[in-house]
Amino acid sequence: MKAQIWNKSGWVKEIDPTKLRNQYSELLALSGFDILNFQEHYFNPIGWTGLWLLGESHFAIHTFPEEGRSYIELSSCNEEYYIFFISQLSHLWEGEKNEKENCP
């Protein structure tokens, strides 16, 4: 396997942890990703972080309720799964950052 990672990060307007967890768990599975583990943390007094460990890398969400938005980031070594996942989210992104990193 070639050392290659596709990375996409940006902001979405949803901040509800239950909605985010359910929506992105479903989309990751639909995209073909192998979800190995999921961890979450609730901050006091508000805020949430979710992290999905994937067989193909990882996906993370960090909510910023004070600003009414969440930061999401996907890193994947599987281009096909990555492209499908990103294509399903194009209407949700507030700003875009899209990178492909090749490691020596």
State where each predicted segment sits.
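Polybasic/polar functional segments that serve as interface/processing modules
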Residues: M1-P104
